[in-house]
Amino acid sequence: MEGSAKASVASDPESPPGGNEPAAASGQRLPENTPPCQQVDQPKMQKEFGEDLVEQNSSYVQDSPSKKRKLDVEIILEEKHSEDDGGSAKRSKLERGDVSEDEPSLGRLNQTKRKLQPQDDEVPQKLQKLEEGHSSAVAAHYNELQEVGLAKRSQSRIFYLRNFNNWIKSILIGEILEKVRQRKTRDITVLDLGCGKGGDLLKWRKGRISRLVCADIADISMKQCQQRYEDMRCRRDNEHIFSAEFITADCSKELLVEKFRDPEMYFDVCSCQFACHYSFESQVQADTMLRNACGRLNPGGYFIGTTPNSFELIRRLEASETESFGNEIYTVKFQKKGNYPLFGCKYDFNLEGVVDVPEFLVYFPLLTEMAKKYNMKLIYKKTFLEFYEEKIKNNENKMLLKRMQALEQYPAHENSKLASEKVGDYTHAAEYLKKSQVRLPLGTLSKSEWEATSIYLVFAFEKQQ
């Protein structure tokens, strides 16, 4: 990483090099002759998906042996408590992969010609039942997650990984709110889509917004989110805090506009963190999610979020000898290789103590194309590595990384031990120390944690005038 100070942050030599995606996968517009969203020819898009994956896979094979990932920012981790309470059940998706240098070519994609379902009433009854079953499973999973205090979270194996993801979100949210303030200084309204237990409430307070609508499928999570909000208000009697409403709904099947207290409400920002991929079970659900996210945005408003990178997931899957990959922190299991439909491409994801629920692959060029229906333009899409490398150059962002304990101290303090006991999980930090003249300690993520978080990307769309 670049920056005035130096530190080793998860410089994983086996993790995939960033910035090698083909144009269609890197957040750029699709070819101008691509049909409108509602008229997208699915077999054609499916073919483009396959071609993109093959190109992506080839570029990684060429680059991975010679490129060493080095995240270098020198951080001394001193605080014992994170300034930003991210929430124990925020949708932190994480994947990884010990990827070999000789990756097999991708299998043939399913080219079955079938039309996109334009309306809910055209979805076969059997499919509707399957979707209802999956939605119930997602809601049940997040409802069953227990609230965990700060002391307990600090003992978690993924404590730093979750803080790192939380830092990514903090920077993303903060910068987008600053963009909004360039055109309006008051009455900023936000929709938090898939808000979970309210892990981003503190971010919205710090962002000095005026009004927040939280929506999530899990009713117990929503009650906990509302309680967090009430607790926040009680702790800050003399400080203005945004008004809020809380909606329990499946945001991929129900229209939120029908549930708003104010049916004429519009938003400046919609944030969907680690959640939009659940909607890609079907075209109808993905479109409903986008309608909720973008349909009520003001001109110049933003749809922001984080989601798994489909190219990285498939790359690691194809490099695996089985239908699954992962490490001691997380696992991802697909049903089979070589068949990656645009919708309903399910995989099972497990993250230590946080997530254990089916998810769906999001082909980002398709998401970009579908968003055009709501007059949305992609303004950027970056991997977590690319986002980190860019934002860590700012000293304020660097200090926030420290305050949030988003990196682990290496070497460990004499009275403590490293988060991972796995052999080789800190070789990147040890090697960096040998090669660099830096003062100790360093801030880093273990190799296992970096393998998990490095499959994610950050995105931002803007509502056109």
UniProtKB/Swiss-Prot annotation:
Keywords per UniProt: Methyltransferase, mRNA capping, mRNA processing, Nucleus, Phosphoprotein, RNA-binding, S-adenosyl-L-methionine, Transferase
Gene Ontology cellular component list: fibrillar center; mRNA cap methyltransferase RNMT:RAMAC complex; mRNA capping enzyme complex; nucleoplasm; nucleus; receptor complex
Motif (Nuclear localization signal): 113-115
Pfam families reported in the protein's UniProt record: mRNA_G-N7_MeTrfase
Region named Disordered: 1-132
Annotated site residue numbers, mRNA cap binding: 197, 203, 228, 277, 359, 456
Enzyme Commission identifier(s): 2.1.1.56
Residues binding mRNA: 165-166
Known regulation of activity: Methyltransferase activity is activated by RAMAC.
Leading EC class: transferase
Role, per record: Catalytic subunit of the mRNA-capping methyltransferase RNMT:RAMAC complex that methylates the N7 position of the added guanosine to the 5'-cap structure of mRNAs. Binds RNA containing 5'-terminal GpppC.
Classification via PANTHER family: MRNA CAP GUANINE-N7 METHYLTRANSFERASE (PTHR12189:SF2), MRNA GUANINE-7- METHYLTRANSFERASE (PTHR12189)
Family: Belongs to the class I-like SAM-binding methyltransferase superfamily. mRNA cap 0 methyltransferase family.
Name of protein: mRNA cap guanine-N(7) methyltransferase
Record organism: Mus musculus
Species classification: Eukaryota, Metazoa, Chordata, Craniata, Vertebrata
